[in-house]
Curated annotation (Swiss-Prot):
EC number: 3.6.1.7
GO molecular function: acylphosphatase activity
Gene3D superfamilies: 3.30.70.100
Pfam families registered for this protein in UniProt: Acylphosphatase
UniProt keyword annotations, A-Z: Hydrolase
Species of provenance: Bordetella parapertussis (strain 12822 / ATCC BAA-587 / NCTC 13253)
NCBIfam families tied to this protein: PRK14424.1
Keyword Hydrolase: yes
Protein's name in the database: Acylphosphatase
Recorded catalytic activity of this chain's protein: an acyl phosphate + H2O = a carboxylate + phosphate + H(+)
Highest taxon above the source species: Bacteria
Gene name in the database record: acyP
């Protein structure tokens, strides 16, 4: 994938998103969509992620992150597109 077509988005997800398999499901979905980056729980009960891929891949991942797995209850998703020199090789749960 050309760097010119690579997008990076930083995401914070709020709601009932810890203890419901959100990160594990996010990794599975990321692999299905072909995006790279990472996802982790934060001490305040939110989930943080960085998603990298084409605009279409990133948009599809953001759409999924807004819903999450069946047990999750996403209340809010904040995302910010950013420029990042680092290129991730895969999508990991931190």
């Amino acid at each position: 994938m050309s760097d010119a077509h690579m997008e990076t988005v930083h995401v914070i997800v709020k709601g009932k998103v810890q203890g419901v398999g959100y990160r594990h499901a996010a990794v599975r979905r990321a692999h299905m969509l072909g995006v790279t980056g990472w996802v982790q729980n934060l001490p305040d009960g939110t989930v943080e992620a960085v998603v990298q891929g084409t605009a279409d891949q990133v948009d599809h991942m953001l759409e999924w992150l807004r819903r999450g797995p069946p047990a999750a209850q996403v209340r809010e998703l904040a995302s910010e597109r950013s420029f990042e020199e680092k290129r991730y090789k895969h999508f990991a749960q931190l």
